[in-house]
């Protein structure tokens, strides 16, 4: 043990515990007199553990940024569709001026600007937004044989 050349020796459990951290996850379930023990042991190097935590944080930040940007919506940009629709495509310009678009999300443009469509007389007929006149209401009731109740 003096000043001689270093001697090779076998790896002991002390060496393993020096270079590795031991994480033991112990999960206990009790289902009506039935005990299930799940012991899961993971051996990782300390350096690798830090790297894995940093990588996990990077992935979490990327996912958070993506979901914040997307907003979990079908259309991830500002909803300008109805502005374009009413300015360029709508069939009746006077109707568009009388009942401007209202709402957000899937209800944009399907109602007039008054909340819950109260006081607005518009409806969709054959894919066109039209004013609901007494004559049109009568025609709808006659065609379908039921009283027209606007929702």
Swiss-Prot record:
Source species, domain of life: Viruses
Keywords: Capsid protein, Disulfide bond, Late protein, Virion
Gene Ontology CC entries for this record: viral capsid
Subcellular localization, as worded in the UniProt entry: Virion
Transmembrane segments: none
Main subcellular location of this protein, as a coarse class: virion
Function statement: One of the minor capsid proteins that constitute a network internal to the major capsid proteins and outside the lipid membrane. The minor capsid protein P12 does not serve a cross-linking function between neighboring capsomers, it may play a role in the viral capsid assembly.
Domain comment in the entry: The hydrophobic regions might anchor the protein in the underlying inner membrane.
Protein name: Minor capsid protein P12
Source species of the chain: Paramecium bursaria Chlorella virus 1
